[in-house]
């Protein structure tokens, strides 16, 4: 499998680039939001997913490993193909998509072209146990505000040496409504850790 490409951008289209790696040109489909940063003759490192189908072999490239992992994860959901997976990842960063899935934000997910209500429900069902975050809220808070605050708290706990599972467990116990800043959230989480 081709996992990483490091080379020079030779050509660019509306949805792909050709990357020259030691004289071999690889055509790689990329996210539209990442296409603008890929300039001709620039050196790139792309984390890739090779998809083999009846009609050919296709490479999908991403600027980071986390996005590539999410692409493969989305493809594991029945009814989600590469086109829909790219559309979802073009709309959401992996971190934001974690929150959308954990909080079952159907409204946000169905705004993505090609993702209807059934696909959104299937994503929630099939990925709920595979994503990195746990749902920290049950109310209608916006994903952006909630993610910013609690994403920072989560990252802060990880940087303090907690495992992802420990951080999720502690965050699941915290009363979210009383916390206004990441610092308050981390302090409260550390109190739970010491109990």
UniProtKB/Swiss-Prot annotation:
Q: What is this protein called?
A: Holliday junction branch migration complex subunit RuvA
State any GO CC term: Holliday junction helicase complex
A Gene Ontology biological process noted in the UniProt record is: DNA repair
The listed locations are: Cytoplasm
The primary site where this protein sits is cytoplasm
Q: Please provide the record's free-text comment about the domains of this protein.
A: Has three domains with a flexible linker between the domains II and III and assumes an 'L' shape. Domain III is highly mobile and contacts RuvB.
Report the Pfam families cross-referenced here: HHH_5 (PF14520), RuvA_C (PF07499), RuvA_N (PF01330)
Origin: domain of life: Bacteria
Q: Which gene encodes it?
A: ruvA
SUPFAM superfamilies this protein is in? Answer: Nucleic acid-binding proteins, RuvA domain 2-like
Subunit structure and binding partners = Homotetramer. Forms an RuvA(8)-RuvB(12)-Holliday junction (HJ) complex. HJ DNA is sandwiched between 2 RuvA tetramers; dsDNA enters through RuvA and exits via RuvB. An RuvB hexamer assembles on each DNA strand where it exits the tetramer. Each RuvB hexamer is contacted by two RuvA subunits (via domain III) on 2 adjacent RuvB subunits; this complex drives branch migration. In the full resolvosome a probable DNA-RuvA(4)-RuvB(12)-RuvC(2) complex forms which resolves the HJ.
